Amino acid sequence: MTLSVDIPRDPMAPAAARRAIEALSGRVADDVIPDVKLLVSELITNSVKYGGEGALRLQIEAEGPRKLRAEVIDQGVGFVPVARDRPATDVGGWGLHLVQTLSNRWGVHEGSTHVWFEIDR
């Protein structure tokens, strides 16, 4: 199953992305969906904060109930991906650390802000 949706860039974008992910119910395992929602929310939040102008695109390709690839694409200039270990007392900046920790693989397409992660359990 493929999910592809444009999400308006505004403070409610993470919630809109989580609602869109509900379309995966029944095709993706119930214990995988919460992690997908969390990681997509973190990436969408980063895109809203740093991703330039225009809509955001969320694409998810579910290859089975426990295997999927999610991508968040925006109009930003790109960045060097760094997921740092964070002190437990830090309030913010956990997004890429969570992506690194909860996904099997993740990365950024060079030259754009096109962040992806894969879950394969």
Give short role names for the model-derived ranges.
Residues 1-4, 47-121:
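Conserved beta-strand-loop-beta-strand hairpin that lines the nucleotide-binding pocket
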Residues 2-18:
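STAS-typified acidic loop motif
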